[in-house]
């Protein structure tokens, strides 16, 4: 697809493997991951600096695991508040739904508050670790065109200078109003909510109560959220007939804050901004050499804090696949699995967010009365209460097709789900999270067994070329048993007993884990070779001997 550009000779040229449009969180995460894989990356951003106005405030365990994968989680954690509960209140202040999960199966608290601009700054600083990654601010993407083997981008600087970029791939992380998506005429299906919300951030939190509260007041629903670094966020629905300009007037802002504070005059306003909530999904995530990610691919209301986290899932899913393709280790058909795996889950998160918004502000007043009564009764049913407390209603990502091999019934299979991340003990006695022992790699993880036993020499060579780590998990008391050591295998102790429980529950002894920590396949030692051949095929790995049939029999 060719897009014409004004006939102006470009002054500067950049030639890279991946161009990323947008220096938001998804673009910066893509840049960090690809950077550590040695990919030559250029990030182009229209603004002159990172956005610092009110944005996302919730980061989940999956997103923190993604931060961990690029070595930034320790710098991110100081800007978070772990175990951040969400409570729905009636107009009289009674809590009718409490979302307070205390599980950490992926290594991190499931719900966390955070300050997005500070975390974005951590990611921007993170790319400076890689000489192969550059970020150019004050660059407007004016046009682009696709050829058989590259994408050409035409940029304009703030001074009006023209630049041209040649890239093998373009990843569009340029937001809900994505220029790239609109230029490609990709339908952005969904709707825009009729009501807007004004967001107010206040320093030196005048309430200082923990957690986040959603008050379902039919007169004016509002949100009160405790954020890190003593910041309080209030969100108020903008009612019909009101405008942002009116609400910004001191007397009207005072009236809004008097709803939640005893002294609305004694506050330190950081900033305020009006938002419109959209629920939209791109029809396609890949268009030849262009891939859409984050808000460019899907946008959703804020009520479950999943817009940011869904973007992190996009980046984690796409980055390792793109790296394999660029490195020549897989054919570009692997990139088709990005949409296949991510689009359905993004749709599920949009639906959940819309539902949560309808709980907070039902379209009809009688629906709010019904909600309060039903929720009060359901709280007396322990299974229902646990369902909300433990956040079981959140659709966990599960892929039914794509870069995976499933054997048996999909409903009970762990394949296509994220693998757990417990603590493990290393042979030197150190205790660490599982991902830290594996790195940003594939892993073949075996309970008690040597994971190399079921593989041919050719398969070992093939999977090692991908950077695969071979892990043998043993009970912690066996970690120093010398006769169980195998060359090229990392032995770890099951510190918490969680890995033993996982393998027992799923009736498998071997797991093939992808770099994004999803289970690509399960096996036993006698079937591992056959399973790896199938996986190599569906992932379109490029080694010519990937289709050799190997299966050991005792």
Swiss-Prot record:
MF-aspect GO terms: 3-(3-hydroxyphenyl)propionate hydroxylase activity; FAD binding
Record key words, sorted: Aromatic hydrocarbons catabolism, FAD, Flavoprotein, NAD, Oxidoreductase
Record Pfam families: FAD_binding_3 (PF01494)
Chemical reaction(s) catalysed: 3-(3-hydroxyphenyl)propanoate + NADH + O2 + H(+) = 3-(2,3-dihydroxyphenyl)propanoate + NAD(+) + H2O; (2E)-3-(3-hydroxyphenyl)prop-2-enoate + NADH + O2 + H(+) = (2E)-3-(2,3-dihydroxyphenyl)prop-2-enoate + NAD(+) + H2O
Classification via Gene3D superfamilies: 3.30.70.2450, FAD/NAD(P)-binding domain
EC number of the protein: 1.14.13.127
Enzyme class: oxidoreductase
GO biological process per UniProt: 3-(3-hydroxy)phenylpropionate catabolic process; 3-phenylpropionate catabolic process
Pathway: Aromatic compound metabolism; 3-phenylpropanoate degradation
Cofactor(s), names only, from the UniProt record: FAD
Top-level taxon: Bacteria
Disulfide bonds: none
Residues that hold FAD according to the record: 17-46, 285-295
Protein family (similarity comment): Belongs to the PheA/TfdB FAD monooxygenase family.
NCBIfam families: PRK06183.1-1, PRK06183.1-3, PRK06183.1-5
Matches recorded under HAMAP family: MhpA (MF_01652)
Summary of the function given for this chain in its UniProt record: Catalyzes the insertion of one atom of molecular oxygen into position 2 of the phenyl ring of 3-(3-hydroxyphenyl)propionate (3-HPP) and hydroxycinnamic acid (3HCI).
PANTHER family: 3-(3-HYDROXY-PHENYL)PROPIONATE/3-HYDROXYCINNAMIC ACID HYDROXYLASE, FAD-BINDING MONOOXYGENASE
Name recorded for this polypeptide: 3-(3-hydroxy-phenyl)propionate/3-hydroxycinnamic acid hydroxylase
Organism placement in taxonomy: Bacteria, Pseudomonadati, Pseudomonadota, Gammaproteobacteria, Enterobacterales
Gene symbol of the encoding locus: mhpA
């Amino acid at each position: 697809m060719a897009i014409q550009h004004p006939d102006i000779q470009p002054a500067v040229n950049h030639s890279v493997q991946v161009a990323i449009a947008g220096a938001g969180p998804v673009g910066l995460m893509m840049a960090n991951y690809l950077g550590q894989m040695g990919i030559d990356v250029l990030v182009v951003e229209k603004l002159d600096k990172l956005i610092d106005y009110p944005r996302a405030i919730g980061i989940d365990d999956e997103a923190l695991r993604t931060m961990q994968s690029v070595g930034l989680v320790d710098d991110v954690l100081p800007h978070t508040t772990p175990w951040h509960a969400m409570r729905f209140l009636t107009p009289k202040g009674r809590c009718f739904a409490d979302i307070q999960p205390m599980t950490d199966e992926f290594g991190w608290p499931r719900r966390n508050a955070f300050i997005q601009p500070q975390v974005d700054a951590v990611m921007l600083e993170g790319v400076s670790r890689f000489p192969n990654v550059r970020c150019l601010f004050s660059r407007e993407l004016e046009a682009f065109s696709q050829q058989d083997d590259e994408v050409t981008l035409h940029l304009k600087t703030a001074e009006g200078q023209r630049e041209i970029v040649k890239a093998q791939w373009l990843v569009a992380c340029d937001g809900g109003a994505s220029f790239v998506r609109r230029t490609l005429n990709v339908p952005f299906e969904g709707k825009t909510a009729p009501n807007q919300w004004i967001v107010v951030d206040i320093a030196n939190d005048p309430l200082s109560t923990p957690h986040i509260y959603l008050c379902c007041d039919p007169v004016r629903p509002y949100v009160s959220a405790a954020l890190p670094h003593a910041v309080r966020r209030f969100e108020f629905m903008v009612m019909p007939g009101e405008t942002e300009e009116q609400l910004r007037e001191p007397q009207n802002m005072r009236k809004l804050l008097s709803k939640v504070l005893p002294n609305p005059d004694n506050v330190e306003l950081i900033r305020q901004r009006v938002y419109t909530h959209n629920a939209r999904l791109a029809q396609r995530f890949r268009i030849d050499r262009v891939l859409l990610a984050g808000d460019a691919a899907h946008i959703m209301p804020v009520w479950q804090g999943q817009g940011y986290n869904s973007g992190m899932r996009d980046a984690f899913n796409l980055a390792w696949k793109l790296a394999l393709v660029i490195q020549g280790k897989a054919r570009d058909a692997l990139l088709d699995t990005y949409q296949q795996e991510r689009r359905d889950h993004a749709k599920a998160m949009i639906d959940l967010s819309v539902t949560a918004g309808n709980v907070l502000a039902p379209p009809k007043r009688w629906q709010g009365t019904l909600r309060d009564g039903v929720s009060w009764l359901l709280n007396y049913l322990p299974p229902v209460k646990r369902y909300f407390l433990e956040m079981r209603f959140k659709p966990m990502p599960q892929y039914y097709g794509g870069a995976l091999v499933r054997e048996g019934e999909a409903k009970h299979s762990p394949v296509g789900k994220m693998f757990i991340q417990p603590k493990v003990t290393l042979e030197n006695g150190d205790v660490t999270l599982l991902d830290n022992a594996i790195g940003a790699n594939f892993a073949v993880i075996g309970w008690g067994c040597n994971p190399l036993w079921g593989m041919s020499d050719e398969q070992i060579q093939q999977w090692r070329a991908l950077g695969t780590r071979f892990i043998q998990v043993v009970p912690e008391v066996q970690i120093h048993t010398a006769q169980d050591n195998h060359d090229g295998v990392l032995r770890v102790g099951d510190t918490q007993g969680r890995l033993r429980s996982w393998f027992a529950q799923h009736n498998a002894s071997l797991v093939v884990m992808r770099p994004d920590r999803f289970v690509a396949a399960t096996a036993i030692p006698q079937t591992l070779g056959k399973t790896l051949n199938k996986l190599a095929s569906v992932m379109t790995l490029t080694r010519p001997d990937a289709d050799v049939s190997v299966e050991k029999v005792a």
